[in-house]
Amino acid sequence: MQYSIEINKNTEIFDIDKVAKQATGVLMRQGKSVVLATVAREEKQVEEDFLPLTVQYIEKAYAAGKIPGGYVKRETKPSDAETLTARIIDRSLRPLFPKGYAYPTQIVVMVLSADPKVDLQVMSLNAASVALYLSDIPMKAPVCGVRIGKIDGNFILNPNNEELQNSTLDLYVAGVKDELLMIEMRALPDQKENEIFIEAPYADVLTQTTSQNMNELSEDEILEALNLAQKAILNGSNAYEEAFSKHKKNSQIELKNEIEHPEILAFIENNFQKQIKKAINQMAKSERASELNKIAKEILNLEIAKDWSEESILNTLAKVKRKLIREQILNEGKRADGRSLNEVRPISIETNILPNAHGSCLFTRGQTQALVVATLGGENDAQMIDLLTEKNPISERFMVNYNFPGFSVGEASPIKAPGRRELGHGNLAKRALYPSVDENYPYVIRLVSEILESNGSSSMATVCGGSLALKAAGVPSLKLVAGVAMGLIFEDNKYAVLTDIMGLEDHDGDMDFKVAGSKDGITALQMDIKLGGIDQETLKQALYQAKEGRIHILNIMEEATKEIIVNEEVLPKLELFSVDPSKIVDIIGQAGKTIKEIIEKFGVSIDLDREKGEVKIAGSQNEQIKAAKDYIINITSSQKGTKKGSKDKDISDFELGQEFQGIVKKIAPFGAFVELKNGVDGLLHSSKIKHLDLSENQSLKVKISEIKNGKISVDLCE
């Protein structure tokens, strides 16, 4: 059975009861993209008290007419992009599972055909949402996901991939009806063109350069965009419900009833409440856990407890602890560590504590500590990523890796490959910091965050430490960026918004809302809600309270930058210069022989831009780089047939304002070389000939506009 639904600028076609019928399968089409979403569950419940949900998102190479690269020509482990999309689907759907649901459940989304224009993340979430709604798992309504962009100052709903390239905002929102469940946002920087005059070995050039806008969003702009998203989500959720409610399977599922133990609850509250409250309020994280364990053992050893199971005692103790934490916050405005609701934990900062690293920062906030290290490299160090919707691999020049070892929370667990959580936290920090790093910065940058101690907000500590580590490595970042994690306690129509939450408040609270940005606005945010939805007024308070906390942290970070001493000795050196683009082939040599010899001889790395004639040499010592540059200049100026610049000719009889009927001898990306007389050329900059379709040997009337350093620049005669 097929349904075609027109919602939120998209035409979505769903086939139900057609494929994967042993599970609940939905085939969704949008444009030329085809996605299969399936939901399957086990018949037996798990004993543990958690939601056993697994989400997998798989992009098939054949969907884009590709064969997987590498030695193994098939899909193997998921890429980082696939893992992050799976996390988005998981975080959007998880809050809607009913309390007491304990059946192992798997949601699989497979991309079978990929249209480069279609947003696969939004499409995949909506396909998974419909499949879940059609299953026998009780869901109150289908989830809907949307993306909001901003082009020319206007918010647009569900931009396609081409439009997103020109957007200054990427806001992904999921919700059900009028409730928001999950938010991911990042600011997208753009470049502003400027003209500058630069002197180069081949020719002085008036060229285009760029400056970068971070495009942070204000709190009011975020709320405006979320309002647009909320309306679209309501529209989509209603449309899915109307189309598919009559096809939903009857639910025969038994939910686990939470077994109440009023006698245990009364006993603990009457006899141990003061001890529990003392443990919560007066202890550090590790001491608190130890003290609560002592209380549990004391109860278990009592004669009265012999009639109660250990599980019921521990569960009831956890409930009492949760209740006391929440009541204290709501009724007294006081948190477990004594802070007020909007207070940030004490912060300490040390920079460049690792003598041989390019840049480092030890950022400590309360009992959360991140060691963030910046490393600079050449173009060959960039991460190559093969995306399904891109024809060729793309180069990632700014990387953030987040590591969370077990010892950071006092656990004796082996350190393994990064999991979904590590990838997600690293991606959030990258999104927050990326707008502050100029895209034209010549070095590849890798930030590594080692979480040494964790008691909440470790991803935001990574953002703060990362921004300072960039400064410590001498990276000219546009602005400092800081992040803060916000929390929410909601009970009986009373609520409290918490700034800089610790682990206890994250675990026993109702929201995890991370906000990062500069003093001028927000660069990234992420929200996960446990309530089943949040209203705009609460969201507004959280955003403005986060701004207050963020600026407080940035003020401390600004003071710390005054103490930074960049270790120039360990930083890589780089030289960027231009040659005649036609000479790039001489630098490379036959089958790359010449460039390999240069790299081996001088111990440097070399990157070439054939179109612009740019040469980038990187190395550890200035002497090596200078020697390699001189060697390359010698190659490009000594090849047979090389046309030498005007500085090698006698230009003493040329004057400003002289007019010539010249001949176009060569066309380069930055302009045209026009022969004036006696083999002397003048440069006609590209900005002066945008409206012309020039060709070599074309006759052109020009006049001299500048003579400098033996070189001539010309303009067109009017």
UniProtKB/Swiss-Prot annotation:
Its EC number is 2.7.7.8. The keyword DNA-binding does not apply. Keywords: Cytoplasm, Magnesium, Metal-binding, Nucleotidyltransferase, RNA-binding, Transferase. Pfam families: KH_1, PNPase, RNase_PH, RNase_PH_C, S1. GO terms for cellular component: cytosol. It is an enzyme of class 2 (transferase). Mg(2+) binds at D506, D512. One of its GO terms (biological process) is mRNA catabolic process. InterPro entries: ExoRNase_PH_dom1 (IPR001247), ExoRNase_PH_dom2 (IPR015847), ExoRNase_PH_dom2_sf (IPR036345), KH_dom (IPR004087), KH_dom_type_1 (IPR004088), KH_dom_type_1_sf (IPR036612), NA-bd_OB-fold (IPR012340), PNPase (IPR012162). Residues 657-718 form the S1 motif domain. Residues 572-632 form the KH domain. Belongs to the polyribonucleotide nucleotidyltransferase family. HAMAP family: PNPase. NCBIfam families: polynuc_phos, PRK11824.1. This is Polyribonucleotide nucleotidyltransferase.
